[in-house]
């Protein structure tokens, strides 16, 4: 476990360090953006509080020290006003995580039976039609689905709200209505990817000798599927789903702005366009941290789903 986590921690460290160094290359310096005019003592105090009183590496380690202690920096307004990034995260992050969880639930509920069906009908007409459709869906960016769904389903047909977000604590039914279109926008290409992965693994499992032997013993197709085929075949699917959690959080950047959902993706967009680079650095670091966490969790889960995975790691 430790051997797998340590390299991922270097990913977090490296990605945030590179971003921090890139911030030093901005045409407008960070000092010009965030330091309010004042006397020398006031300016020096502001520089020290933001870690801008040294070189690029001093700035990075000042930020990193604050980040690991839960201080994600500040959103700095013209004139020197500040708002802790944690205030925005406390509302935006749960919304994005809720969206990602919904997407994963929908994607897995659809892709697992779809992948099994196409695997058992491999080479037939229905398999070819579904496979070509899935390939096309996987090739289209999720924001294209978002725009199409918002325009046709939300605006022209008026079946669902094209914009806005209602918290589940206020009205759960309206919450579900406002989440359907953004969830579908992210879920459609995800379903395509998951289904194709599971289809390939199920086809490979069906060709294994132990499956042929189980069939020769008279075991039912249902028992063969759930006992001998689906369990080892789900390894790649679960791995992909876990790794995709971080990608989905990044994918919410455009989708949340299309549907006016006040999540982490929207906050990243706001930080970019309003040049709130301290907040942006913390947002990207959090996505990297979630990526590491999901990798660690899936590493443990795969050991239970497929013991061969654990044996290969311990070999």
Regions found by a protein language model. Name each.
Residues 18-26, 51-54, 65, 133-161, ...:
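Membrane-water interface segments at the C-terminal ends of transmembrane alpha-helices
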Residues 2-8:
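N-terminal signal-anchor/signal peptide hydrophobic helix marking the start
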Residues 152-165, 256-265:
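Peri-membrane helix termini and adjoining interfacial loops of integral membrane proteins
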Residues 11-61, 157-178:
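Hydrophobic alpha-helical transmembrane segments of membrane transport/permease proteins
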